[in-house]
Structures are given as C-alpha cells and as structure tokens.
C-alpha cells in the first residue's frame, strides 16, 4: 500500500492560504497592493474588530472586467505576469496570483467591480467556492469586502491577538503603503470611526504626515542620491531622538517594506559616531532599484529581498549618513563661533535674525560624489543632495536693516493682546536663576540652586501664548470681507457641520454655504490677522474634540505663533521666558508635551564618578 498520496485539492489550497495569509494585516497588505496596482489615486479602508470581522477596501482604479471577475479568485490567476522572464522585471506589487485565492479559502469574500463605461458585477466566494455572480449597481473602480476571517480555520483563529493589537498591525501596514505612495489619497476608518487621512503630497511631506508624530516639530534630515541602477532617499531625525530598539528603522525597496539586516546595519553604522551604545536611530530608507538587480520572489509575504551586483549599497548608505553629520558638525561649530563674535559686538544681544537669503533658507544643500570603482569612502561622480528641513516660520521675517524694539517684537509674538503682561520689561537677570545660554538653538539652559534645567523654547513659548489667549478678554470682531473656503474630505465636512454651534460660543461665526463650502464671518478680536490659521484648523478636522474646541483652537494658534527650533532669540527675551517658566510653574505645553528636563548637581557629579 502506498504511503505517499496526492492531497485533496481543498487541503492544498488551505495549506497555501496559511503561508500567504496569517492574520488580518496580511489580507490588508494584499488588497492594498491590488488597489495600488490598479492605478487608483483614491483608496479607502474600513476595518472592524481588528480586521477579524471585516476588512473593506474601495478604490477608483481600472476595475475588473466581467470575464476576469469570474476567475480572479482561482489559484495562480494573475494579470501581472505572463512568462518566466517577467519575474526578472516585476513592476507591480503583486505578481504571484495567490492573494485572492488564499483570502477566498479562509474567509467570505465579495468583490464588486467594473471597467469605465461598462456595467458593474459582483461575485461572492465562500470557503473558496463561488456562491453567486450577478449584475450590480454601477460603481467606479473596485470594492473588496472580506468578512469572517478564519471561520473555517479554528486553530489559526485561536492564535490571533486581541482586536486592539490586530488593529495596530493593520495600521502599520496601512502606514507603510501610504508613505511609499504619496501620490495616492488614503483614508482609514476603524470600527466606523475615521482614523487616518492622507492627501496627495510629496514623499518628504508624506513622511512628515505619517511618521512626524515620532519627533517634535517634524524636524527630519534628508539625503538624496542616485547611482547606477539605484535611487536613494534617506529621512532621519537628529541624534537626540534616538530610540532603545530598531522599530523605527524602516526600509522600503521599490515601494515595498522589507527586512534586510545588511541595510539596517548600514543605517546604524552611519549613526555610530553620534549615538551611544544600545541607542538606535529613527530612520526611513527609500530605495528605487532597477528590477533586473533585485528579486522579491523569495518570501511568501515579500518581506525579504535579494540584490544582484550591488555590493556597494550598504557602505554607500553608511558613508552618506556619516558625511552628512560630519558636515552638520562643522556648521554647528562655525555657527557657534559666529554667535560668540556677535555677542561681543552687539549691545542688545539680538542674534541671527532670519533673512531672505540663501544662507538662511529652509534647506541646506550639499553635494557628494561617487568614485568610479565604487569604493565609496569619498564618492566623486554622482550627486547626493542633503537637505535639512528647519521649518523656521517666524511671523514677519526681519532684515538686518530694520531691528524692532524689544516691546514691538513681543507685541507681534503675543498677537497684540489688549494688555501687555507686567513682566514684559527690560528686566535684568533675577537672583533666583542663572541663565547659561541657548543650546542647539532649541533649549534654554538655566542654573537654579543645585539644579540645571534644559527648557524647550518652543514648548515654553507656546504655553505662555496659550495662557495669554485663554485668559484674555475677548470680543467678537466681524470681518470686513468674509472668507469662503472649502474642505476636501467628506468626513471633515460632517464634523465641521456638527460643530458650527460650538464655534459660536467662542465668538467664531462660520456658516455653511453649500456642500463642503463655508464662509468665515466673525472671529475673536485676539485672533485678528490669523484667519488663515483658523481656516486651516477647520480644513484638518479629523475627529470631534472630546474636551473643548476653544482649548484645541488656541493650542493650535499658540503652536503656530510660538518661536521654533533653530530660532535664535535675544538675551532679554530668553530671560522673560525663563521668568514666566518659574513664576507660572509651567510643566507641559498645551498638547501635553514636557517643557523641560532637569538634572541635579548630585546626578551630574554621579555621572562623572564624583560621588
């Protein structure tokens, strides 16, 4: 009797499905790949109960014809490749023809689709078997609805995490697809609540939108490079935003997230001179590689990759990052030298006022080259552009020819409130603290008794402005010319409409003219000249505020008007901020972030073994 036998067809499909689909986020990844490959520029995702109960994706892509819809769920059916040679030049995210068949085996699957100008059709598959196929109301693109995941795989279902954890995994996949496709509008709803919205933007802006919350003030550095068969973009944070694990090192090759140890190690090596042991950088690497030099067909979920004839790549990544920080270090030292000279030559200690010239623009550009034999210690030919995005946006930039008085400067920052605070004076330094100076154009260093404070100048100034706004006497001010504006997102439109009466309570009159179109008619007097910020606040509404609209709005205004990182401020204004810090005992900015970090003399002495 033969011991070896052919497996049942259904069992074979279940085994294959288990390799490609192991949890809800795997389904989401495959369906997003299909939507992106369809040429869609708008994709919406709906998740319920961590994706276990339901994952619904709609797109406005090219759609599926009636004939293709009838067979799209069968194993190894695909429109992406035709022959073996196609595996060497894969341009799409999907290509194996396994995704829909695997999903159909382990869930209930319903697909509705149409090609432009043709009727829509719907097919439902249960446990891999077609349940029905019918004509459907016309839609633009494709809708894929997956329900009851693993209902026929009880063993696999038992190993799923609780809904909240599965939701986080789905969110991670959603963000990875969104960040690598900035030319697509993405929208995510979880349990019928809108969670994420990303509109079309540049890659740099999309990185800020998706990952900007990891660091304060969205301060990313950027390197761009191009070599034979490779285009490279690296986004990274300053050294002070290091992490204790590697989770924020992300690598994308041809718009796919991958796990490649050699590349992650090259990123870590590039930061080795600026990060201490067991600290890891926050870094996002984007590579576009000629398809003949890369193979994704080595892992069921395409998480691994094999490179051909690119031995220089890891070293190049490391060298570029190292050289970037070497140049930054030299600039910091030079800037420090310039500041010392300016302190000696100026009486009023106004330092480094922003100017509209290249030296103070928002981007610093460097060029590196690559030598011919690909030994990359000192590249020579191809250009690398390093950009540091300071995002300094000071209301009314000041030229050197005109320097306003201190009082004028403060009045502008404090939005011309009706009464200036009593401590807006050219006061000398108090005896309670000793101001040591400004660090990295970001922190104020203060000695107080036996303690040293590192105070975040932006967070502190933001809190002071916020309290001034909240506590000021307000009157309603009618705009001479009402401002009309539109919101692009339907969910934002619904939220804004529901909040119109709440805005009236804080002296903001905004009326809805028609669908997604509004008119701003009145604002509080203290918000004079900041209509644009208020309108931007309206346009970015993503969820209803639980606590207070007034709190959220004034926190936004304060954040936009406060001094930023890399703003060098006068000695007098620094002392004013520090006085307010100690007098008001401020601890957190309006958004909840800590304002300062404190080190005691004992802790400092202990760190150098003096205790």
Curated annotation (Swiss-Prot):
InterPro entries: DNA_mismatch_repair_CS, DNA_mismatch_repair_MutL, DNA_mismatch_S5_2-like, HATPase_C_sf, MutL/Mlh/PMS, MutL/Mlh/Pms-like, MutL_C, MutL_C_dimsub. CDD domains: HATPase_MutL-MLH-PMS-like, MutL_Trans. The keyword DNA damage applies. GO terms for biological process: mismatch repair. GO terms for cellular component: mismatch repair complex. SUPFAM superfamilies: ATPase domain of HSP90 chaperone/DNA topoisomerase II/histidine kinase, DNA mismatch repair protein MutL, Ribosomal protein S5 domain 2-like. It holds the Pfam family HATPase_c_3. One of its GO terms (molecular function) is mismatched DNA binding. Keywords: DNA damage, DNA repair. The keyword Lipid metabolism does not apply. This protein is involved in the repair of mismatches in DNA. It is required for dam-dependent methyl-directed DNA mismatch repair. May act as a 'molecular matchmaker', a protein that promotes the formation of a stable complex between two or more DNA-binding proteins in an ATP-dependent manner without itself being part of a final effector complex. Belongs to the DNA mismatch repair MutL/HexB family. PANTHER family: DNA MISMATCH REPAIR PROTEIN MLH, PMS, MUTL, DNA MISMATCH REPAIR PROTEIN MLH1. NCBIfam families: mutl (TIGR00585). This is DNA mismatch repair protein MutL. It comes from Borrelia recurrentis (strain A1).
């Amino acid at each position: 009797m033969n011991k070896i036998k052919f497996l049942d067809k259904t069992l074979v499909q279940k085994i294959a499905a288990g390799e490609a689909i192991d949890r809800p986020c795997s389904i989401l990844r495959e369906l997003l790949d299909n939507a992106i490959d369809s040429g869609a520029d708008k994709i919406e995702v709906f998740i319920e109960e961590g994706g276990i109960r339901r994952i619904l994706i709609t797109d406005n892509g090219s759609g599926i014809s009636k004939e293709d819809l009838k067979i799209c769920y069968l194993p190894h059916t695909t429109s992406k490749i035709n022959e073996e040679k196609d595996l060497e030049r894969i341009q799409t995210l999907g290509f194996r023809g396994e995704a829909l068949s695997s999903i159909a085996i382990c869930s209930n699957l319903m697909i509705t689709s149409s090609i432009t100008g043709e009727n829509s059709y719907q097919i439902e598959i249960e446990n891999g078997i077609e349940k029905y196929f019918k004509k459907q109301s016309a839609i633009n693109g494709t809708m894929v609805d997956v329900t009851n995941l693993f209902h026929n795989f009880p063993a696999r279902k038992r190993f799923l995490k609780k809904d909240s954890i599965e939701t986080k995994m789905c969110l991670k996949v959603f963000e990875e697809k969104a960040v690598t496709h900035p030319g697509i509008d993405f929208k995510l709803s979880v349990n019928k609540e809108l969670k994420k919205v990303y509109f079309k933007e540049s890659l740099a802006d999309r990185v800020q939108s998706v990952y900007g919350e990891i660091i304060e003030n969205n301060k990313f550095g950027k390197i761009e490079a191009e070599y034979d068969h490779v285009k490279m973009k690296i986004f990274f944070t300053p050294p002070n935003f290091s992490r204790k694990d590697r989770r924020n090192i992300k690598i994308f090759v041809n718009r796919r997230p991958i796990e490649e140890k050699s590349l992650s190690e090259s990123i870590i090596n590039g930061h080795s001179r600026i990060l201490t042991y067991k600290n890891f950088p926050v870094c996002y690497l984007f590579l576009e590689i000629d398809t003949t030099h890369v193979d994704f067909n080595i892992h069921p979920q395409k998480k691994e990759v094999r490179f051909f004839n690119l031995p220089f790549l890891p070293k190049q990544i490391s060298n570029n990052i190292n050289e970037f920080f070497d140049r930054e270090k030299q600039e910091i030292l030079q800037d420090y030298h310039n500041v010392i000279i300016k302190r000696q030559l100026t009486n009023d200690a106004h330092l480094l006022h922003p100017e509209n010239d290249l030296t103070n623009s928002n981007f610093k550009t460097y060029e590196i080259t690559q030598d011919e034999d690909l030994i990359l210690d000192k590249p020579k030919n191809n250009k690398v552009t390093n950009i540091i995005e300071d995002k300094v946006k000071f209301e009314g930039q000041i030229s050197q020819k005109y320097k306003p008085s201190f009082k004028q400067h403060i009045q502008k920052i404090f939005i011309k409130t009706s009464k200036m605070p009593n401590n807006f004076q050219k006061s000398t330094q108090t005896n309670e603290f000793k101001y040591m100076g400004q660090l990295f154009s970001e922190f104020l260093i203060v000695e107080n008794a036996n303690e040293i404070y590192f105070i975040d100048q932006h967070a502190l100034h933001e809190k002071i402005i916020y309290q001034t706004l909240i506590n000021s006497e307000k009157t309603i001010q009618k705009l001479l010319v009402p401002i009309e504006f539109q919101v692009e997102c339907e969910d934002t439109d619904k939220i804004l409409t529901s909040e119109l009466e709440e805005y009236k309570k804080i002296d903001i009159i905004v009326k809805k003219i028609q669908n997604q179109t509004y008119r701003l008619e009145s604002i509080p007097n203290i918000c004079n000249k900041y209509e644009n910020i208020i309108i931007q606040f309206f346009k970015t509404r993503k969820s209803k505020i639980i606590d207070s609209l007034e709190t959220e709005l004034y926190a936004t205004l304060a954040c936009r008007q406060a001094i930023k990182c890399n703003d060098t401020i006068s000695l007098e204004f620094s002392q004013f901020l520090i006085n307010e810090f100690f007098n008001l005992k401020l601890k957190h900015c309006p958004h909840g972030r800590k304002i300062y970090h404190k080190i005691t003399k004992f802790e400092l002495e202990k760190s150098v073994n003096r205790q």
